[in-house]
UniProtKB/Swiss-Prot annotation:
It comes from the Bacteria. One of its GO terms (biological process) is translation. SUPFAM superfamilies: L28p-like. The keyword Transcription regulation does not apply. Part of the 50S ribosomal subunit. The gene is rpmE2. InterPro entries: Ribosomal_bL28/bL31-like_sf, Ribosomal_bL31, Ribosomal_bL31_B, Ribosomal_bL31_sf. This is Large ribosomal subunit protein bL31B.
Length: 91
């Protein structure tokens, strides 16, 4: 490996998803702004907080909600059903 190709701040960083209460340690250059956390091995590591990860994202966990299961045509029919019925009565 070539010397001096990695940035100076390339180190082991703890990525922690607080919503899933899970963390991962990997080598990274991510800016942690001085935040640290003690990991399960008893050592203190720079901490990068995550809002969402594969442990908490609905697509990965399978806990997603089906907001809309109807198609466009049925939505259109529901929206304009009253207009269409009054139009048919006028004839």
């Amino acid at each position: 490996m070539k010397p001096n190709i990695h940035p100076d701040n390339y180190r082991t960083v703890l990525f922690f998803d607080s919503s899933a209460n899970e963390g991962w340690m990997i080598r990274s250059c991510a800016e942690t702004h001085g935040k640290t956390m003690v990991w399960t091995d008893g050592k203190e590591y720079p901490l990068f907080s995550l809002d969402t990860s594969s442990a908490s994202h609905p697509v990965y966990t399978g806990k997603q909600r089906n907001v809309n299961t109807e198609g466009r045509a049925s939505k259109f029919n529901q929206r304009f059903q009253s207009v269409m019925s009054s139009f048919r009565k006028d004839k």
